[in-house]
């Protein structure tokens, strides 16, 4: 019986150490604040917590003056009002899994534009990380423009506002430079990335650890 108590005590000590390590990590990790960072995007939500629809509305409102986003902004408003969409687009809004996507034909016959959003709860319990991704499929290849790529926003749970955060500050090496196509997760926590370079193409995975991502080779 004494040996059993010793084993139980050892297990409890290990669990306590793991919890303490996680708490210590949460206390020491801080997201950077930039010197010229004075833009705060207000997120309005009716419930106790914001949903992916609330984040989408905030980002679309913030981006509506950009020519690229005017069509999705108009269709999003019509979708919320349960009206027919005008730009041959299609929305998937998965509130439970915190994911939304908008798919619409591009300018050319084989072009398709995808816009995706999702969010993660950060381990510090103070923030959420929101991703807004644009992917342009040209037949069997991926195209690029100044709008293609994944942009990230850091949401403050108390202030109910979010701000832009640079990809390199959360561990993502690809920031919309046209060499990578992002696929945000509808389920799970990791981002899949298809990278193209010098005629070659391969997949990588951005693994989420509660604060940031790390790049791994896709299985």
Language-model region placement:
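Terminal domain-start segments
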Residues: 27-121
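Mid-length scaffold segments of soluble, non-membrane domains
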Residues: 126-165
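Bacterial Sec-dependent N-terminal signal peptides
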Residues: 1-30
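Short, surface-exposed coil-to-beta transition loops
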Residues: 112-115, 130-131, 140, 145-150, ...
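Surface-exposed loop/turn elements that mediate protein-protein interactions on large endomembrane-trafficking
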Residues: 93, 100-105, 154-166, 208-212
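Structural signature of eukaryotic scaffold interfaces centered on beta-propeller domains
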Residues: 116-125, 179-187
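Short aromatic loop motif centered on NTY/YTY
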Residues: 161-219
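Short beta-strand segments that buttress and anchor functional surface loops
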Residues: 101-104, 131-137, 191-197
